[in-house]
């Protein structure tokens, strides 16, 4: 919040010579260049391995953004298992695994299993040294597996106003889901009360 008017500064927990220790960000542009150079250096050092772990395709949360897909934190245990891997082994060959994520979408599940299988088909795994063959190092033939937005094929058609509102339909669907339990309970209690009256 900006300071306005000639009033005392509230909660002024300053110390002596605090002006000498103000944090400024005049190096923002320089830091950006430094980070870019560091990424390039690391990429050259670990080449031909990719910079980051393989991430899953996930659908963004909330009604506003759920039409888009993006990279997630890690593959679910079910996805890893369906691809014929174990979580511990997957982590050693450059695959991110997130034990907390749950699958609620069959399309995304299938896409991620396919992504894992494609990754497995393109990697070359060999022992890091002769003594410990279980410790692997990964060489990736294709370093990146980009996440593409699914194409939406929309055909041109005449505009029709049938009096239905997409917003209202979604709003009612959400409301119905939210209150389904309490409505069923009320209906059940009402039916029981009527049955009691008839007796």
Curated annotation (Swiss-Prot):
A single GO BP term for this record reads: cytoplasmic translation
List of residues that carry Phosphothreonine: 144, 152
Q: Where in the cell is it found?
A: Cytoplasm
Query: Sorted alphabetically, which Gene3D superfamilies does this protein's record hold?
Result: 1.20.5.110
Q: What is its main location?
A: cytoplasm
**Cited PROSITE patterns:** RIBOSOMAL_L13E
InterPro entries given in the database record: Ribosomal_eL13, Ribosomal_eL13_CS
Q: Name one GO cellular component term.
A: cytosol
Q: Which GO terms describe its molecular function?
A: RNA binding; structural constituent of ribosome
Cross-referenced Pfam families: Ribosomal_L13e
Q: What keywords sit in the KW lines?
A: Cytoplasm, Phosphoprotein, Ribonucleoprotein, Ribosomal protein
State the superkingdom: Eukaryota
Role noted for this protein: Component of the ribosome, a large ribonucleoprotein complex responsible for the synthesis of proteins in the cell. The small ribosomal subunit (SSU) binds messenger RNAs (mRNAs) and translates the encoded message by selecting cognate aminoacyl-transfer RNA (tRNA) molecules. The large subunit (LSU) contains the ribosomal catalytic site termed the peptidyl transferase center (PTC), which catalyzes the formation of peptide bonds, thereby polymerizing the amino acids delivered by tRNAs into a polypeptide chain.
Subunit arrangement? Component of the large ribosomal subunit (LSU). Mature yeast ribosomes consist of a small (40S) and a large (60S) subunit. The 40S small subunit contains 1 molecule of ribosomal RNA (18S rRNA) and 33 different proteins (encoded by 57 genes). The large 60S subunit contains 3 rRNA molecules (25S, 5.8S and 5S rRNA) and 46 different proteins (encoded by 81 genes).
The entry assigns this protein to a family as follows: Belongs to the eukaryotic ribosomal protein eL13 family.
Q: PANTHER family in the record, alphabetically?
A: 60S RIBOSOMAL PROTEIN L13, LARGE RIBOSOMAL SUBUNIT PROTEIN EL13
Query: What more is known?
Result: Present with 133000 molecules/cell in log phase SD medium. There are 2 genes for eL13 in yeast.
Q: What is this protein called?
A: Large ribosomal subunit protein eL13A
């Amino acid at each position: 919040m900006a300071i306005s008017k000639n009033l005392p500064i509230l909660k002024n927990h300053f110390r002596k010579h605090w002006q000498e220790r103000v944090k400024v960000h005049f190096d923002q542009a320089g830091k950006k260049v430094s980070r870019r150079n560091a990424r390039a250096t690391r990429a050259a050092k670990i080449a031909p391995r990719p910079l980051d772990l393989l991430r899953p395709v996930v659908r963004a949360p909330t009604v506003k953004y759920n039409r888009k897909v993006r990279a997630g934190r890690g593959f679910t245990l079910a996805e890893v298992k369906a691809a014929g891997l174990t979580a511990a082994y997957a982590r050693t060959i450059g695959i991110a695994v997130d034990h907390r994520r749950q699958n609620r979408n069959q399309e995304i599940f299938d896409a991620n299993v396919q992504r894992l299988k494609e990754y497995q088909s393109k990697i070359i795994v060999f022992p890091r040294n002769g003594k410990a063959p279980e410790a692997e190092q990964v060489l990736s033939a294709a370093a990146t597996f980009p996440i593409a937005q699914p194409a939406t094929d929309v055909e041109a058609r005449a505009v029709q106003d049938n009096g239905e509102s997409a917003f209202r339909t979604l709003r009612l669907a959400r409301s119905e889901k939210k209150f389904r339990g309490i409505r069923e309970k009320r209906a059940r209690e009402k039916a029981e009360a009527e049955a009691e009256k008839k007796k």
